């Protein structure tokens, strides 16, 4: 086997590495996490990747018992795959059942995504508003 074949990683391994992000650094109510991008033919950051990374960055700031409940994101500008991403996670609220985080993703040119993520304590089902199914 050649040296290149021994060190090659699969696309799934590359994706898992990109979603791990860097080590969080906290200052006041903000946590900063660095990330990188997958290759994309246009040279721009793929939106699905950056929203997944935003959720992963936010999840680093809540207890493991809190699971993702929702995320709402707004793409502000195109990202460049040649530049690292900086995830600024702001702690908006930690309640008994829910946690809320705002994530601002930036590169050298400014914001590329802003999102709000919600997490719910595991095992605490929410209120159901739907009527029961007819028989």
Question: Which residues are covered by each model-predicted region?
Answer:
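Terminal targeting signals and extreme-terminal segments of soluble enzymes
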Residues: 1-135
């Amino acid at each position: 086997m050649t040296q290149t074949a021994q060190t090659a990683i699969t696309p799934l391994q590359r994706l898992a590495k990109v979603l791990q992000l860097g080590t969080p650094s906290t200052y006041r109510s903000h946590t900063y996490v660095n990330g990188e991008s997958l290759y994309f033919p246009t040279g721009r950051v793929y939106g699905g990747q950056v929203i997944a990374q935003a959720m992963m960055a936010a999840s680093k700031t809540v207890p493991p018992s809190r699971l993702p409940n929702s995320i709402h994101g707004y793409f502000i500008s195109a990202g460049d795959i040649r530049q690292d991403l900086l995830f600024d996670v702001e702690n908006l609220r930690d309640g008994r059942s829910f946690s809320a985080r705002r994530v601002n993703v930036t590169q050298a040119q400014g914001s590329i995504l802003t999102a709000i993520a919600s997490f719910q304590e595991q095992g605490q089902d929410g209120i159901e508003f739907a009527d029961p199914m007819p028989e």
